[in-house]
């Protein structure tokens, strides 16, 4: 649950969500991610550090640059946690829809 709290806290920040959403298009460098954002490259690096600590992002060296991408394991764990609520909501909806109207 600690990792889940960390992941939820990480994506609670609007700038981090923007960075994370940009990574959904594929791996990118800090410079690429910073383009068009209202924050500096060092700030983007700090946001990536938080996302990485939460298990949502991984990185690799490519020459002198670091390339960041969404970590499917961390994202899968977050999705599985969220899916439990979706499943409960669907079950409740199904039960309501199948009630006898009389």
PLM regions with names:
Residues 52-63, 69:
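Beta-hairpin "wing" of winged helix-turn-helix
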Residues 2-40, 65-76:
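N-terminal helix-turn-helix DNA-binding core of bacterial DNA-binding proteins
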Residues 43:
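Residues in the helix-turn-helix
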Residues 21, 35, 46, 52-53:
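Alpha-helical residues within the helix-turn-helix
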Residues 7, 48, 64-66, 80-84:
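Short, structured secondary-structure boundary patches
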